[in-house]
UniProtKB/Swiss-Prot annotation:
Alphabetically ordered keywords of this record: Cell membrane, Glycoprotein, Membrane, Phosphoprotein, Transmembrane, Transmembrane helix, Vacuole
UniProt xrefs under Pfam families: Opy2
Listed name of the protein: Protein OPY2
Residues with glycosylation annotation: 172, 185
Major site of localization recorded for this protein: membrane
InterPro entries the UniProt entry points to: Membrane_anchor_Opy2_N (IPR018571)
Positions where Phosphoserine occurs in the chain: 285, 348
Bias type Acidic residues, positions: 141-159, 282-302
GO cellular component labels: cytoplasm; endoplasmic reticulum; fungal-type vacuole; fungal-type vacuole membrane; plasma membrane
Encoding gene, per UniProt annotation: OPY2
Region (Disordered): 1-28, 130-193, 282-360
Amino acid sequence: MSSSSKASASSSLSSTATSSTSATRGSDGCVVCDSTASCPVCASGEYCVMTSLTCDKCPSTYCAKQSDSQLSSLSSSSSSSSSSNSNEKTSLIVGFTVGIVGGAMLIALVALYFINKRYWKPKRQKNKALKLEEASQSYGNEEEYFDDEDDDDEDDEDDGGMRKDESHTLFNTSLVPPTLNVPGNRSSASTTRTRASNILPIAYIPGVTSGLSTDKLQSKLRSSSKRQNAAGDIRSHITLGSSILDGLDDEDDEHNQVLNKDADDNLITAIRAKPKLVQIAEEESDKEIQDLDVIEEQTEADDLSHMAKSEASHGNNDEDDDEEGSFILDLEIPESIRESTQGSRTESPFEDKFEIHDER
């Protein structure tokens, strides 16, 4: 410390001492300070120091020289404060910059979305529709691919639904790919809108095959019909087999049981016939024609004997044949007609044009 500072310090201390001794004391016995102490003007490298207030002494100030440790602490504190201030400023600048950039990007994205929705998207759709329309026109008229040529007039509900689908398809033709309107796909579109089928239902009817030629067979049938339809050989019975009347008998079974109780006198006597199928070998020869003549003669004799037996047993079998599924009509031919038609061919309304008898 310099001599001047020491002198000033000593003078200040002496003055404070004299002031403290000369100062008045209060009721508590402590000195009463009249004014606050003020720091003097210190030289470079010095700092102002104030003493503490005690009961016997008022505070005093003086200049003291700064030490190296105090200077380093002051410099470090000042540097730390300045660095903290700079860090705060940097963080503020970075945050402000990020906020500005993020806000600008958000505004740009929103603007692009609205521009795309209002201008760019309708323009792209319009260009696409024009291209598809040009492509569809290059394949021909569009309306001919949607003609509904339905032959089924009863399916009106489906036709109405198809008309709705057709109108909807025509309305959205610009949005449909052009490959759907190609003429090659027309057949598939027409088949899906109709109930037509490519399958023809054919019922199998079992028949009798014959190896005889048409001319020979017709000549044999004519000769057999001439022999069978003589004046005295007119048939007086018609027999309907059970294969024809079985369906009706099954449906009316319960109804007939009720009627049988009240109408026993109106019952019809019937006999049941059993149909047979005969297969003729497919061989064209004169021997078969001769065999056919022999068979026809035998069957004629059998028919005559069978008719005689049936007429004899007809009266005895009325009660036994009440539940059968066929009936017999008895026709009486006057003798005058029989005598007048002898020697001539008479056609019967019940004539069997084609008969095939079982081989015995």
